[in-house]
Amino acid sequence: MLVGCVNRSNISNIQLISYDDSSITVDADAAQPEYGAIYHLLFRGLPNSNQTVPIISTSEEQTKQQFPAYFKTFIDNKRYQTFITSSTKNSNGSRRIVINTKALKQDLEQNSIIRKFGY
């Protein structure tokens, strides 16, 4: 299933490949595929996966305003890449990306961006 979204003025197509309790594997076709994949998980969710709803339930704008220091480091300093287990180029130019969702959620919990168990 392909999912499109606009992020950082780029259109990102994300195709779910597989998932388990601690990771999600996607193919992403965008100028910044790793960022696009993380963005989808955080603010959009991935249909037909174990993460169909966004990890962060509040709006992107509201969350970034509430936690500016965290997101400056996370996005501008590319800290999100620490949650990418693997990123390899496919023959069609897209990238196959494995995201450690367990570590990502734990980091968001430790920094009070989300609460444990979504409450």
Residue ranges, per PLM feature:
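Domain-level marker for long, solvent-exposed, non-transmembrane regions
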Residues: 5-119
